[in-house]
C-alpha cells in the first residue's frame, strides 16, 4: 500500500510549497494521499490527520478502505511558536552555548511575528 504524505503541518516552515509539491507528486504517480502532524510538542498533535472511512476497526477493513479511496486529508498549519519551542528543547538537551540561545531568541521572535501575520490566513486543509 504505497502513498505520500501530502499534508505535514510543519513542512512549510523550511520549504514554502512542500505540501503542494508532495500533492503534485502523489497525483502524478497515482499514489494515495496521507497527512501527518509531525508533532514535536503536544499542542501539535492532530494538526494533520488522515480520516479513514472503514467498515470496522480492523487492519483488513482499514486497508480495504484505503484501497478504495475512503480517506480524507484534514489539518492546519502548526503555529511557528511550536517550532521555536521544540528548537529551545533541542538546545537545552545539547547544552548549547550562549550564541545558540541568542540565535534561538531571534528565531523565536520571527516565529511569533509569523504567527501574528498568518493568523486566520486560511491554512486549514480539508481534502484539498
Can you describe what each PLM-predicted range is?
Residues 1-128:
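Charged catalytic cores and adjacent phosphate/nucleic-acid-binding surfaces used
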Amino acid at each position: 500500500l504505497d502513498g505520500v504524505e501530502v499534508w505535514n503541518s510543519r513542512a512549510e516552515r523550511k520549504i514554502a510549497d512542500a505540501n503542494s509539491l508532495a500533492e503534485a507528486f502523489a497525483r502524478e504517480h497515482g499514489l494515495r494521499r496521507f497527512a501527518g502532524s509531525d508533532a514535536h510538542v503536544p499542542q501539535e498533535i492532530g494538526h494533520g490527520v488522515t480520516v479513514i472511512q472503514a467498515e470496522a476497526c480492523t487492519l483488513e477493513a482499514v486497508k480495504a478502505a484505503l484501497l478504495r479511496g475512503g480517506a480524507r486529508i484534514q489539518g492546519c498549519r502548526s503555529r511557528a511558536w511550536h517550532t521555536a519551542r521544540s528548537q529551545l528543547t533541542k538546545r537545552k538537551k545539547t547544552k548549547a552555548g550562549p550564541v545558540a540561545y541568542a540565535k534561538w531568541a531571534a528565531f523565536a521572535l520571527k516565529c511569533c511575528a509569523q504567527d501574528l501575520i498568518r493568523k486566520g490566513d486560511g491554512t486549514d486543509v480539508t481534502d484539498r
